[in-house]
């Protein structure tokens, strides 16, 4: 499966991969946790990732009106990308965290459900948005973000991730919206 490889050379990808720490058996046995905190500790790599996201937007001719990101780590990369593109950032949060009137969506998790909210005036009809987050696994959170945006009449033109865990069905769940991930790991 090809993601972004035609845009970035192997040296660039490998230098970025070196900033991700893998922690076996966290938070539970059998999980290989991909820790992004070393990358977050580096201004150089935060800038590099943001510039790579801009390059992907340009390469795909994505011209968004806003960037949307879910709590919590979508709040890291979303505002950085939005600032570089000269557009706004729209936060999607857990229930009760936004101060004004909101719309919400409940979505299923493997063992239970979750709720996300967005201000009801954050997006207007015809707004083009990109959803960004640190990690794509099953796609449930991003699918919920997409549905919230679409409820308000927005068009999700792309999804951006620092890391994608392959083989968990996220690409099928988010189809036909394009997905670009900087780093790909087996689930």
Say what each PLM segment does.
Residues 87-130:
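Short, glycine/charge-rich flexible loops or terminal/linker lids adjacent to PRPP-binding catalytic cores
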Residues 134, 139:
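Conserved G/P- and acidic residue-centered "switch" motifs that form tight phosphate/ATP-binding loops
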Residues 62-71:
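Short glycine-rich phosphate-binding loop at a beta-alpha junction
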Residues 65, 127, 157:
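Conserved acidic residues
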Residues 2-63:
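Active-site-facing substrate-recognition patch
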Residues 30, 67, 89, 159:
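Residue-level signature of catalytic and energy-coupling elements of molecular machines
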Residues 2-12, 143-187:
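PRPP-dependent phosphoribosyltransferase catalytic core
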Residues 76-85, 146:
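Short Gly/Thr/Asp-enriched flexible loops that form oxyanion-binding sites at enzyme active sites
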């Amino acid at each position: 499966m090809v993601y972004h490889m035609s845009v970035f050379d192997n040296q660039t990808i490998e230098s970025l991969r070196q900033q991700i720490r893998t922690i076996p058996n966290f938070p539970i046995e059998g999980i290989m946790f991909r820790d992004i905190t070393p990358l977050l500790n580096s201004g150089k790599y935060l800038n590099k990732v943001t510039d790579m996201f801009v390059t992907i937007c340009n390469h795909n001719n994505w011209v968004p009106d806003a960037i949307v990101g879910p709590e919590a780590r979508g709040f890291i990369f979303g505002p950085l990308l939005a600032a570089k593109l000269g557009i706004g950032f729209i936060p999607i949060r857990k229930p009760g965290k936004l101060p004004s009137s909101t719309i919400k969506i409940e979505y299923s998790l493997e063992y239970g459900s979750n709720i996300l909210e967005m201000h009801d005036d954050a997006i207007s009809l015809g707004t083009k948005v990109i959803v960004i987050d640190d990690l794509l696994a099953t796609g449930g959170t991003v699918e919920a973000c997409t549905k919230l945006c679409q409820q308000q009449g927005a068009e999700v033109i792309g999804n951006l991730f620092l890391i994608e865990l392959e083989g968990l069905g996220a690409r099928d769940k988010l189809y036909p919206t394009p997905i670009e991930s900087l780093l790909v790991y087996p689930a």
